Amino acid sequence: MSNAEHSSNFIRNIIIDDLDSKKHDTIITRFPPEPNGYLHIGHAKSIVLNFELGKEFNGRTNLRFDDTNPTKEDTEYVESIKEDVHWLGYNWSELHFASNYFDEMYKRALLLIKKGKAYVCDLTPEEIKEYRGTLTEPGKESPYRNRSIEENLDLFERMRKGEFEDGSKVLRAKIDMSSPNINFRDPIIYRIAHASHHNTGDKWCIYPMYDFAHPLEDAIEGITHSICTLEFADHRPLYDWFVKECEMESVPRQIEFARLNITNTVMSKRKLKQLVDEGIVDGWDDPRMPTVAGLRRRGYTPKSIRNFCKAIGVAKADSTVDSQMLEHFIREDLQETAPRAMAVINPLKLVITNYPEGESEILEIENNPKDESAGKRAVTFSREVYIEREDFMENPPKKYFRLFPGNEVRLKGAYFVKCNEVIKDENGEVTEIHCTYDPETKSGTGFTGRKVKGTIHWVDANNCIPAEFRLYEPLILDDCEENEGKHFLEQINPNSLTICKGFIEPSAKDAKPQDKYQLFRHGYFNVDPNFTSDDNLVFNRIVSLKSSFKLK
């Protein structure tokens, strides 16, 4: 049994029991995002969970936009969410908008009023909060709690017609102001908001609250298993109360699981919006963002995200996942599929003084050292090449096996070269290193005369492509997003992005946005879709080549 299957057993067992007992003939799950922002990796976990359960049990999974708050929602987010779900590899059975149920919700609210289970309240938001009480003190009843059914029906109809100002009245459920569950203390189910809605326009000026709308939406669609995160566990009795008292024909079951927390990662939509609004990142799809759009632009594949979400499974208690686990799955995917190339991101010119001027040759370098069937590619080699600046040191420490005066290394797929001279500018900065090569040491010839301890990569200075390389580190310094109560903006890593100008071998000349490469010794890179143009090739580093992380 896989980790994913084992971890998600408690939800699967519920579904299996329901099917075996004939409680349900089939299952219907749903992914119900609010279209007020871009989806992030936490939403991806919910998408994978719901759609995979639907697939496993031959059921259906709907995509429903929980669009009951007109002031925060936008069609832009609707379209981005649809794109993200498709990109992750899923097709919904039905597409719904909660706003399409507003008429039905209004009828159910009228039913509650007629049953004496709801009333119009004139308390201010501050007074409602004060009257609600605390976890240790019961609430106080609103002075408007015992209005007659007739008066409540009249006031609610006038609320709908737009006769009252925003915030002047609300419709509340009439339950129990002394309940130990604060959610039962006469929760608000409708508020006034004179705002245009992205889907219904100006038809409505009253809008249902989440706790009222969500169970009705599930019941209307015939959802069998309404899977949500743990913060809604205390809301489940209220969820069930609304389904029962609104006399819904279908009775969905709410099941809670732990939300996803990842080290060095902000998961709050409000905080992510703050990062965008304050210009700390360059948008919702910034490659440092944990949004699906950001991960896609960074270079993560749908398969890697799905495998990550399956591997972490579903738990009943909150925990934090190491961000290196997500990196593990993109490495696992790309090491099989990404073409190899050599690139120098911080170039230093190396001149081979005994190589014939004006000449070049074609070398063959393996595409994947672990897969002979991947074949080889042609790379040109000439008198001048670029190497990484960090691959040369004038005064190296012990056990430094790369290039330094008097030392010999192999240029990957080419020859041994020995450093003989260092050229500097007026500031003492190394600008060139002059070497000699040994023609007998060509790779692939079987030369065994002597060995070198270092192999470094390079690109032909006379046949390479200028490129920009964007190197990313975690955006948040602390492992825990809320470490010691510090404001999360204090934990922003000032070095989360480093931009380097370098060169890549000509095999990348036809690279298109979202193409992925393994760059020798550097890691896996993705061609940036936003900044790449015909004359400006930009690579985002997805992950480094190796990690100490071990999948348990």
Curated annotation (Swiss-Prot):
One of its GO terms (biological process) is glutaminyl-tRNA aminoacylation. Keywords: Aminoacyl-tRNA synthetase, ATP-binding, Cytoplasm, Ligase, Nucleotide-binding, Protein biosynthesis. The keyword Cytoplasm applies. ATP binds at residues 34-36, 40-46, 229, 259-260, 267-269. Pfam families: tRNA-synt_1c, tRNA-synt_1c_C, tRNA-synt_1c_C2. InterPro entries: aa-tRNA-synth_I_CS, Gln-tRNA-synth, Gln/Glu-tRNA_Ligase, Gln_tRNA_ligase_bac, Glu/Gln-tRNA-synth, Glu/Gln-tRNA-synth_Ib_cat-dom, Glu/Gln-tRNA-synth_Ib_codon-bd, Glu_tRNA_lig_a-bdl. Its EC number is 6.1.1.18. It catalyses: tRNA(Gln) + L-glutamine + ATP = L-glutaminyl-tRNA(Gln) + AMP + diphosphate. GO terms for molecular function: ATP binding; glutamine-tRNA ligase activity. It is an enzyme of class 6 (ligase). CDD domains: GlnRS_core (cd00807). It comes from the Bacteria. The keyword ATP-binding applies. A motif ('HIGH' region) lies at residues 33-43. One of its GO terms (cellular component) is cytosol. A motif ('KMSKS' region) lies at residues 266-270. It is found in: Cytoplasm. NCBIfam families: glnS, PRK14703.1. Belongs to the class-I aminoacyl-tRNA synthetase family. This is Glutamine--tRNA ligase. It comes from Clostridium perfringens (strain 13 / Type A).
